[in-house]
Amino acid sequence: MTTAPITGPGASAETPAQGTTMADSEATTAFRQRIARIDREAEEHAAARQHAKGKRTARERINDLLDDSTFLEIGRYSGSGAGDKARPSGVVTGFGQIDGRQVAVYSQDFSVSGGALGTIEGDKIVRLLDDALRLRIPVIGLIDSGGAKIQEGVGALRQYGRIFNRTCAASGLVPQISVILGPCAGGAVYSPALTDFVIATRQASHMFVTGPDVVRATTGEQISAEDLGGAQIHGSVSGVVHYVADDEEDALGQVRTFLAYLPSSSEVSAPLYAYDDADAQADAEAARSVGEIVPASTRQAYDVVEVVSAVVDHGELVQVQEEFAPNVVVGFACFEGHPVGIVANQPLVDAGTLDVDASEKLARFVRFCDAFGLPVVTFVDVPGYRPGAEQEHAGIIRRGAKVINAYATATVPLVTIVLRKAYGGAYIVMGSKAIGADLNFCWPGAEIAVLGAAGAVGIIHRRDLAKVRDEQGEEAATAEHERLVAEYTDAVINPDKAVAIGEIDAVIAPEDTRSVIVDSLAALRAKNDARPESPKKHDNIPL
């Protein structure tokens, strides 16, 4: 049976001609032309504003970050609709891929009202974060905004609160990376601060709660935006920034580098990279000379980065917060294709001592690795904590306790290598067996004790040495001190005692370091350290 065409009063006067499809209908054609014009005008406007400052547009940044032709934009015309009054908002949101892995990304558009955040922009970011939580995919935020839309008042501030809420919900569940590519001021700074990693360009980015004008008006202090909250300040002084990039290309490239070591969520494993016999042979050969890097004297410095590079896959170590608290080193590397977190004391800077900044840096990194299932390999060469009133008044007790909490609560595989020395409380907190590490090793001659031999002898034999000095002179006292140091070293601080009580699992030759770490990680790969159910809601970390 056939149905006759509708005629009469109910029929539309605009009925398309017979044979017309949705692909070439008048509505579709008009839509294509309208959207093409709006998008072209918006991008031309954005390019004119951003390129003049040496900056990319919001969409150019997304295209540079993601794999080619993978970006799916969501909510492009939220707030305006796609009709004749269509216009872009101050943020671009959507999904794409990085090295074939799905991610969520938002990019603030400074060419639209200075990238200011209002109801529309906040709704788009919140929706993206909610989607990322459901999909269990990483979130990357490209920040370039003048702040909240003042004309929206508390409505704009509310959106910041909603974003903070979702960011906290995602913390430890999916990796979150913020890239500061322009201004980020006021309450907006807390959004990136809540994420796992903050990357900032050296020249264009600024972060501060109160800007130079407010500082000048309230305190009289004259300070530039760069000196107050530039990337270099946050990368080396405050520790807010984890990587200071030379330019936008470097910043976006670092996002891809970080993600290469991370799982898409805490529920899946990190990527596993191909690793063949040729790779193994080359890395084993490089690792044989690691002992030649480290001087036998505990008083001589060396670069621990060279030590780590000698034993990890392909010599590749990606440092995090390289310029902040340089007396310790943290970063990512691989062993036989498996990503791990690396922690190490740096004897080149303050002899590798621990201080307030180093403690913050170590604790946060270890907790991040634990949240996302990355084993932690710790290289120890530490004389203790940095002494002085400055450190005590800055809270070394409270902040140092964070490192203890991070290691003690970690459930991922923990492998520790003591290279030369580990003294006092610093030994305990740096991934010791007593604090919860799984496997601990040391090199021959490593000194593990409450104090170094010289300091211990000076305390234990203070009266005896004073008597020798009074009766026989300074030269005799010096000789006696050296004899007692050698005696104390042989009796107390050699590795044998640590091995005997189980604090050290084995003394290993330096050239065996890589193979021991590889074997240890393989043995611990199936580690299931789920803690028993507890009536407590969560621990009270000494924040």
Residue ranges and their predicted role:
Residues T2-L543:
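Ligand-binding clefts of soluble mixed alpha/beta catalytic domains
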